[in-house]
Swiss-Prot record:
Result of knocking out the encoding gene: Hens express reduced levels of SH3GL3 in ovarian follicles prior to uptake of yolk proteins.
Alphabetized GO MF terms: lipid binding
Protein name per its UniProtKB record: Endophilin-A3
Organism encoding this protein: Gallus gallus
Pfam families named in the record: BAR, SH3_1
Start and end residues of each stretch annotated as Required for dimerization upon membrane association: 60-87
Function: Implicated in endocytosis. May recruit other proteins to membranes with high curvature. Implicated in endocytosis of yolk proteins during oogenesis.
GN (gene name): SH3GL3
Amino acid sequence: MSVAGLKKQFHKASQLFSEKISGAEGTKLDEEFQEMERKIDVTNKAVAELLSKSTEYLQPNPAYRAKLGMLNTMSKIRGQVKTTGYPQTEGLLGDCMIRYGRELGDDSMFGLALLDAGESMKQMAEVKDSLDINVKQNFIDPLQLLQDKDLKEIGHHLKKLEGRRLDYDYKKKRLGKIPDEEVKQAVEKFEESKELAERSMFNFLENDVEQVSQLAVFVEAALDYHKQSTEILEDLQSKLQNRINVASSRPKREFKPKPVITTTLETGDNQQHNGIAYSSSIKSSGSSMHVDQPCCQALYDFEPENEGELGFKEGDIITLTNQIDENWYEGMLNGESGFFPHNYVEVMVPLPQ
C-alpha cells in the first residue's frame, strides 16, 4: 500500500474511533437516502432467510439434506453429472405401503388397498420432485443470483461511501491544517460515491417487480403441486371406496377349525404314540452363525434408489461400519459398501458406543 493509502486508512480509523468513543457526529445523509439504505438492509436479510426457509420447505429433513449434500459433493469430485434426488416423504411412505401390500398378497383386501395407496404416494412424490425443480430454477436460483450480484454490488458501493465519508469528515474537522486541495478531493469523492450508491439502490428498489414475479412463480408451482396431489388423492379415494363396496358385498366365509391331532400317519416326520400320529410342527433350525464384529441381518430386500446406497436381499448378513444418523447405517456386503435404512435390518452385533 502506498503512503497516501496508508494516510487515508489512518484518517478513516481516527475518525471512526472519534465517533465511536468520543461521540463525535459524522456527516448525516438525507432521509430519503437513509430510507433506501434501510430497505436494502431488510431486503438483504429477507433474501438470506428466504433461501434458507425455501430449501427447508422443499426438503424438510435436515439429516437427508446433509446426506444429499454429501452424496452430490462426492459425485462432483468423481466428475459424475447425475446428482442424487431428495427422498420425498410421500415416496418413502409409498415404498412402505407397496412392500407390505405385496407381502399380504392378492387375497388380502387390505394388501390390495395398500398397493393402491402406495402407487398414489409414489405419484405424489414425482409431483413433489417437479415442484422442487421448478421452485429451485425459478425462485431459489434467481434469489441466489440477486444476493450474489445485485445486493453484493450495492453493499460494495455503500462500504466505499462510508470509507470516503470518514475520510471527508476527518479532513473537514482539520481545515487549515490540511491543504484545501485535499479537502476538495475528499468532498468530490464523497459526493461521487454517494451518487453511485444512491443510483444503485434506487434502480434496485424501482425494479423490485422482478422479485414479485419470482414469488408469483413460486406460488403458481405450489398451487400446481397441490392441484395434482388433490387429483391423485381423489382418484385413490374412489379406488378405496370401490374396494370397500366389493368387500361389503362379497359372501362371508365361515371359520372351520382344522384338527392338530390326526389318526392317520401322513409323513415320515410324524411321531406315533399309542396308535395316534402327531404331526410335527417344529423344524430343526440350522446352526447359528458365529459373528464377532458389528453386523446386522436383512429383514427385507432393499433395492438402492440413489447412488451410494447398498442393496441386499432378505437374510443377508451385512457388516456394520458406521451409523450415519437414527435412520441410516453404513455397511459392507460382498466387498461393496454403502448406506441403507435401519428399519430394513435387525442388528445382531451392535456398533461400539
